[in-house]
């Protein structure tokens, strides 16, 4: 029997916690637990029992995600018209939910993205906000399900009265670096892979034929999200123990992180007047850049809203 290590979780000093923050905390703690050669037992400090943040985290499934018998199970909280608790999305769930009237995994993901956006925005009206958020959720889920090799990802999100919205998609898969290694991309290494991943036309499917590329992946999803964030908010991409942050004032940060899988956190602080036009302009610019590098053109799905 392996030795056991009790670890006390003390979050009592945290007064406010957005989805991006608690997702990162959860991944750090989970990776710590998984990488030890002894059994880690998480316990919640007594001083946390009266914390409003702990109440919120227990409600959204944070502790269940860590494997603690505390608070709601993942997927059991109903959420509200301002937030989506931690929810599991799997290929099997999507097929079971939508297969009666949809044909492909991409169709299922589109339906799920629209459903999540309706919850987040309290409306099904196809406003510019609705279109750009649906697009972003769809591309982030596609990235997770098509590249992680686990068939499962987790989503959580929140919106605020000032129009700000934050969307988190995370998985515990192989990570972007290992995924891109399958494409034999020139000059790829474990320091530059995130920079390559946000370039247009870079995908693990680069060396696949059209017949083999069953998901019609062309390597434009992260490229578009990166440029959307540079104009309208903030993007965090963490994968294969590295992270990249970009903000709408064009500031960028890079560094190391413990998580092997992938986290995509996109925050909208403002919205385009014409989402379709913005996406098309970004993709067109990307196609020109990709052509100069001999890479793929975008798929129809990558530029559709």
Give, region by region, the residue ranges found by the protein language model.
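Glycine-rich G1-box
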Residues: 174
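Conserved ATP-binding N-box helix of the HATPase_c
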Residues: 28, 60, 127-161, 222-229
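Flexible, glycine-/charge-rich segments associated with ATP-binding catalytic modules
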Residues: 1, 67, 184, 188, ...
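Acidic ATP/Mg2+-coordinating residue in the GHKL
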Residues: 171
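Helix-loop-beta hinge of the Bergerat
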Residues: 84-124, 185-206, 225-227
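Short beta-strand element(s) in the Bergerat
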Residues: 163-167, 262
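N-terminal assembly/transducer modules of large multi-domain enzymes
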Residues: 1-67, 265-305
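Conserved short strand/loop->alpha-helix "switch" segment adjacent to the catalytic nucleotide/phosphoryl-transfer site
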Residues: 16, 20, 114-138
């Amino acid at each position: 029997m392996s030795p056991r290590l009790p670890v006390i979780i003390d979050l009592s000093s945290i007064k406010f916690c957005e989805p991006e923050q608690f997702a990162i905390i959860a991944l750090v703690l989970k990776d710590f637990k998984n990488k030890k050669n002894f059994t880690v037992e998480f316990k919640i400090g007594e001083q946390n029992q009266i914390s409003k943040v702990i109440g919120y985290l227990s409600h959204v499934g944070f502790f269940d995600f860590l494997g603690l018998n505390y608070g709601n199970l993942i997927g059991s909280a109903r959420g509200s018209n301002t937030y989506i608790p931690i929810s599991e999305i799997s290929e099997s769930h999507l097929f079971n939910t939508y297969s009666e009237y949809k044909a492909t995994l991409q169709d299922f993901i589109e339906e799920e993205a629209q459903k999540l956006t309706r919850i987040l925005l309290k409306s099904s009206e196809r406003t510019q906000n609705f279109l750009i958020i649906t697009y972003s959720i769809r591309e982030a889920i596609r990235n997770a399900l098509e590249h992680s090799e686990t068939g499962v990802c987790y989503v959580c999100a929140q919106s605020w009265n000032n129009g700000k919205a934050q969307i988190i998609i995370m998985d515990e898969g192989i990570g972007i670096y290992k995924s891109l290694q399958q494409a034999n991309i020139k000059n790829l290494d474990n320091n530059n892979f995130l920079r390559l991943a946000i370039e247009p036309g870079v995908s693990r499917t680069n060396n696949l034929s059209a017949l083999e590329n069953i998901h019609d992946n062309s390597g434009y999803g992260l490229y578009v999200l990166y440029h959307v964030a540079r104009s309208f908010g903030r993007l965090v991409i963490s994968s294969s123990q590295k992270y990249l942050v970009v903000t709408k004032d064009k500031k960028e940060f890079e560094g190391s992180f413990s998580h092997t899988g992938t986290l995509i956190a996109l925050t909208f602080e403002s919205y385009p007047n014409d989402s379709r036009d913005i996406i098309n302009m970004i993709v067109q610019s990307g196609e020109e850049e990709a052509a100069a590098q001999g890479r793929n053109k975008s798929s129809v799905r990558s530029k559709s809203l």
